[in-house]
Amino acid sequence: MTDERAILAANAAYYHAFKTGDFAEMSRIWADDDGVSCIHPGWPALVGRQVVLESYRNILRNPDRERLDHRDEKAIVSGSEGRVVCVEIVSGAGVALAATNWFRRIDSEWRMVHHQASPIAAMLAEAAPSSQRLN
């Protein structure tokens, strides 16, 4: 498997863990060091494995959490690091987010070291269900 495909598979595993609420899988995806970071939409920067994973534990245990789909993935690989940029669609909310998921190869596995997502203003109307659109 090429590095690009392996990073895209790790990225898909991240979204699958989010979608299914699988905290154990989410924990396996993140690197085991305090150099990891995460910026959830509207949140301050979180730094450190314990803080980042606690944020996901709280999000995933919420039965009313947002449902995410992702699309338009692009993988960029440079040596032992790579990132995926993609669009996250928050189901039912009419919100599209630009996301960056950064991975590092650790012991032959691609592990997440950073996630960041923020709203894309130009795509808000496009992402909204037709019943919620203003035009």
Language model segments and positions:
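Helix-to-beta-strand junctions that scaffold the AdoMet/dcAdoMet cofactor pocket
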Residues: A31
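A beta-strand edge to alpha-helix "cap/lid" segment located at domain peripheries
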Residues: M1-R28, V36-N135
